[in-house]
Amino acid sequence: PDTNAGETCDNAAIRHHRIAMMLPLCTTAEKASRQSALATDFYRGALLAVKDFGEAYPDSIDLKVYDTTDGNFSNNLASLHNVDIVITPDDDAKIAQIARYTGTHSIPAFNSFIVKDSTYITTPYMMQTYIGQERMYAKAIDYVVETLSATDAPKPVILDNANDRKDKLNFVSRLKERLDREGIEYTTLEFDGNLHKTILEDNLPTSASYFIITMSGHLSEYNKIASGLAAFAESLAAEGNTLTTFGYPEWISFRGDAQDKLAQIGALYYSRFYVDKDGEDTKRTIAEFRRWYGKAPADGIPVQALLGYDSMRYILTALHEGNAILDRPYHGIQSSYNFVHTPGIKGSINDALYIIRYIAGATSPSVTIL
């Protein structure tokens, strides 16, 4: 969705945009790989964005698409000297080559795929579309501290399962340090194995509301605590109190009973992506994808078709306004973009982060974009 639309067709000057996409489409292979199938969905989503943008603005769009697996990568790269921006592939080595070329020729390069790519640090014009882990942790911790600093804040409780993988121990340690600095008291509840309602009620009076902090993002660990937390939430609700359970980006992938329990336990987690499957823009875009390509986009996190759509719609909106980077946040169907330049970094990085919060009884979570 063009939530940041400026001029309309009636008063917009016609602009010319030259965009290159370099994707592993495997057009010469007898059988498509999973990577090429996802790249094709991305490409198809991007084409839908071009179509939608073209219906709103009279700009001229020259889109060049290169298959990075066809053996002509070096020659294709050398032909990009006059494009406005390059969308880079899911390939570390090729991104490095593209970065050297685009940095030398002052061409923005848009990384839609590799979360941990760091070429933006040392290369001008590189655009890393994924918020970095350090910044993501900092923003999530800021949000938790702000929540727990309110006058009527719930009491924080850290769950410490002796048999937990504790894959988020680093995050929890940082959060505890911050809570200590802010003078926010918290309780640590130790247990071993499955977390039962009785363990919670024996240690936490139901006369208060609680903010539970977990130490793992894994589904297997979540399954050890979800049922007990859901039952405990009912006990709290009977006395007019609430339960919030803080979790992690992996929780966005939960399906079935695990997903159903997110609302029951008052789940709150952060993520680089979020799709409102019942949203009008989502349904419209998925329907258009089906109409044009005869099938639904492949499911995944992120959905590659929507990633392609959001990437291209952002790029076209920015180029329409005269730059590769917008001077304000942009909220798409699945991704949000708010590129920033930080000291010591030659390129730019997306600073947007979703906070997803489930409330018991609500049909869908509330979403905040930081």
Where are these regions (language model features)?
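Signal peptide-proximal N-terminal region
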Residues: E30, A37-L63
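Sec-dependent signal peptide cleavage junction
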Residues: P1-H17
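Segments of small-molecule ligand-sensing domains
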Residues: K295-I369
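Periplasmic-binding protein-like
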Residues: M21, H81-D92, A109-F113, P154-N161, ...
